[in-house]
A protein has these predicted regions:
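A structural microfeature
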Residues: 2-3
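Zinc-dependent deaminase
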Residues: 47-112
C-alpha cells in the first residue's frame, strides 16, 4: 500500500476532497510522478465522474471497488467513464469485491 485516505469534504468544506482524489495526490507525492501507470486503486464506493476523470488523467490501469454508487457512479453504474473509448486512457474495473463487508462497515460508521 502506497497511500490511503478517506473523504474529507465535510471536514474541509471542500467539494473536491474525495478519498480517491486525496489518495491519488498522496500516491503521486510518494512516487514522485503524476503518471500512476503501475498503481491499482482500491476503494469502498464506486468513484464519481470527477474521481474517475482523475484516474484517467493519472493513467491508473485498474480500479477495484466494493459498492456501486446508484446516484453518482462513473465506473459503470450510472455512467461508464472508466472504459470510455473516446478518452485517452481506459481503466480496467472490478466491482463488488467484499461488498457485504463494505456495506456492513458503512452501516456501522453511519450509526456512530
Amino acid at each position: 500500500m502506497i497511500a490511503r485516505d478517506h473523504d474529507r469534504m465535510q471536514l474541509q468544506q471542500d467539494p473536491t476532497a474525495h478519498a480517491v482524489l486525496l489518495t491519488l495526490q498522496g500516491t503521486a507525492r510518494k512516487l514522485g510522478t503524476r503518471r500512476l501507470s503501475e498503481v491499482t486503486i482500491f476503494t469502498t464506493h464506486e468513484p464519481c465522474a470527477m474521481c474517475v476523470g482523475a484516474l484517467v488523467e493519472a493513467q491508473v490501469p485498474a480500479l477495484v471497488f466494493a459498492m456501486a454508487d446508484e446516484r453518482r457512479g462513473a465506473a459503470g453504474t450510472v455512467i461508464q467513464l472508466a472504459r470510455e473509448s473516446l478518452l485517452p486512457h481506459q481503466i480496467s474495473v472490478i466491482s463488488g469485491v467484499r461488498e457485504s463487508e463494505a456495506r456492513r462497515l458503512a452501516t456501522e460508521s453511519a450509526s456512530v
